Amino acid sequence: MAYPFQLGLQDATSPIMEELMNFHDHTLMIVFLISTLVLYIISLMLTTKLTHTSTMDAQEVETVWTILPAVILIMIALPSLRILYMMDEINNPVLTVKTMGHQWYWSYEYTDYEDLCFDSYMIPTNDLKPGELRLLEVDNRVVLPMELPIRMLISSEDVLHSWAVPSLGLKTDAIPGRLNQATVTSNRPGLFYGQCSEICGSNHSFMPIVLEMVPLKHFENWSTSMI
C-alpha cells in the first residue's frame, strides 16, 4: 500500500514484483555509477587548465567508449528480457478471471464457475466507513486464492483502460476488441489496491481495483456463497 511522501516502491507481494524491484535496484546502481563518472569528468574539465591540443587520434579511447557502453547495455538488457519472459509465461493456472473495463467501473467474471460475475464500483467518499481509503475502496472486491497461479484475461467494452496493481507488479492494457492476459500470484494474504492507469475520460480517477487474496479454503467458501 502506498503512503504519502513515499520514496520507494510498494512492498512486493508477488515473485514478479520482487524481480522488478531487484531489476530497479540493479539499473539504479548502474545509472548512479555512470552519473558519478560524468560529474567527475565535468568537474575536472572545469577545474584544470590542462588541454591535449596535440591529440588528433586516440584509437584506444575510441575502442573503450564503444565497447563499454555496449557492455553496460547488455547488463541492463539481459535481466530485463528475463523478467519480460517471466511476465508472459503462464503455467497451468488454477483459475481464470475475465476483467472488462467500462467507463467508469470494472466487471469480473470467474470463467471456471457458471454464474460467478459482478461489477465493481468505487464507493463514494460520503459512504466510506472509518478506516476505508478514499478513491480506493470498491463495493465488490476481487477475491482470489493466494500462492496459486491465476490468469487474468483483460479487455474493454468502450475505450482504452489499464488494469494495474503495483504491489503485484501488474499493469495490463484493456483494449476494446483485444484480449490481453496477465498472471496473478500472491505470496501472502491481504488487500491490494490498484487503479486504472490509462486516461479514459472524466472519471478516470474513480476506477479503483481491490484484490483480496485469501487461503484456498476461504476462497472456496466465498465462491460457494456467491453462486
Swiss-Prot record:
Protein name: Cytochrome c oxidase subunit 2
Gene: MT-CO2
Catalytic activity: 4 Fe(II)-[cytochrome c] + O2 + 8 H(+)(in) = 4 Fe(III)-[cytochrome c] + 2 H2O + 4 H(+)(out)
Entry keyword annotation includes Ribosomal protein: no
Compartments (UniProt record): Mitochondrion inner membrane
Topological relation to the membrane, as annotated: Multi-pass membrane protein
Family: Belongs to the cytochrome c oxidase subunit 2 family.
Naturally occurring in which organism (per UniProt): Apodemus semotus
Residue intervals on the Mitochondrial matrix side: 46-59
NCBIfam families the record matches: CoxB
Keyword Nucleotidyltransferase belongs to the record: no
Root EC class: translocase
Alphabetical list of PROSITE patterns matching this protein: COX2 (PS00078), COX2_CUA (PS50857), COX2_TM (PS50999)
Gene3D superfamilies: 1.10.287.90, Cupredoxins - blue copper proteins
Function, in words: Component of the cytochrome c oxidase, the last enzyme in the mitochondrial electron transport chain which drives oxidative phosphorylation. The respiratory chain contains 3 multisubunit complexes succinate dehydrogenase (complex II, CII), ubiquinol-cytochrome c oxidoreductase (cytochrome b-c1 complex, complex III, CIII) and cytochrome c oxidase (complex IV, CIV), that cooperate to transfer electrons derived from NADH and succinate to molecular oxygen, creating an electrochemical gradient over the inner membrane that drives transmembrane transport and the ATP synthase.
Transmembrane regions: 15-45, 60-87
UniProt keyword terms in alphabetical order: Copper, Electron transport, Magnesium, Membrane, Metal-binding, Mitochondrion, Mitochondrion inner membrane, Respiratory chain, Translocase, Transmembrane, Transmembrane helix, Transport
Residue ranges annotated as Mitochondrial intermembrane topological domain: 1-14, 88-227
Major location category of this protein: mitochondrion
Binding site for Cu cation A2: 196, 198, 200, 204
Cofactor, how bound (note): Binds a dinuclear copper A center per subunit.
